[in-house]
From Swiss-Prot:
It comes from the Eukaryota. Belongs to the TLCD4 family. This is TLC domain-containing protein 4 A. The lineage of its organism: Eukaryota, Amoebozoa, Evosea, Eumycetozoa, Dictyostelia. One of its GO terms (cellular component) is endoplasmic reticulum. It comes from Dictyostelium discoideum (Social amoeba).
Length: 258
């Protein structure tokens, strides 16, 4: 089953990725306009661009996370060396996320007035080009490690959902609080605990010398990513506590009748 799915997905050429992402950026704005019009709500030009960007990012995150989980779960079928083993499915996943980074970077540049953000551009260049394209697709190494890093993607839908709810003025809705707690949980469990432990185990148990560029990228980026994840987790928890305190103070107090 694993080999069948892998062989099917790998048959998708780069043209398939180009058509896939192009179609998303074409039909999502039209769909958004229709949904907002049917609900008698206005959707500005800037909002439409931002909604489209975040919806595509959410779809990409869900697909990347799901396929990475499946590939990691079946690692006994393809991993003989945790540092060097690759398979058709891992190759497909890295191509999928790399094309997302490319299209998202282009989207940020084309609509720079609404979206441009230097940290995101730098992230796409460092993570997308150096890690996934160079190490994963060109150098053909550490696929398992890169798949573990892609588990970080599970937090992105909750980050974007927070923005969606905020834009819809639903900050006081119960969904906003639930989304915040789920986001904090996955930040702590996946980004701060699970993935770092797994990646460290790979390098302790089966370290294989890579070339100088790959070694520099991995040993320079991993500590930075870990520190950033801890900092972002702090901001997430701080935001939740702030929201809870604001909600508590805004709740009308009912006076007891004597």
């Amino acid at each position: 089953m694993f080999s069948y799915i892998s062989n099917y997905l790998i048959s998708v050429e780069p043209l398939g990725f180009i058509l896939y992402y192009t179609s998303l950026y074409i039909w999502i704005p039209s769909l958004l306009q229709t949904i907002f019009n049917n609900n008698e709500k206005q959707l500005s030009y800037s909002s439409k661009i931002e909604w489209t960007n975040k919806i595509v990012a959410t779809i990409s995150s869900i697909v990347s996370f799901s396929l990475s989980c499946y590939c990691i779960y079946n690692k006994k079928s393809w991993v003989t060396n945790e540092m060097t083993s690759t398979c058709a499915l891992s190759d497909f996943i890295l191509k999928f996320i790399s094309f997302y980074f490319l299209f998202d970077a282009l989207h940020l540049i084309i609509y720079y007035k609404q979206l441009f953000d230097w940290p995101i551009i730098i992230h796409h260049l460092v993570v997308g080009i150096l890690s996934y394209v160079y190490i994963g697709l060109y150098y053909k190494k550490v696929h398992l490690t890169l798949l573990y890093f892609l588990l970080f993607e599970i937090t992105n839908p909750f980050i974007h959902m927070k923005w969606f709810l905020k834009d819809l003025k639903l900050e006081n809705h119960i969904l906003y609080s639930i989304n915040g707690f789920m986001m904090a949980f996955f930040f702590i469990f996946i980004r701060d605990i699970y993935v770092p432990i797994k990646v460290v185990k790979i390098y302790i148990n089966g370290y294989t010398e890579l070339n100088s560029i790959a070694n520099t990228i991995i040993f320079f980026c991993f500590p930075i990513i870990t520190i950033l994840n801890l900092f972002w987790t702090y901001l997430v928890i701080k935001g939740i506590l702030k929201h809870l305190s604001r909600t508590k103070t805004s709740t009308p107090q009912i006076k007891k009748k004597n």
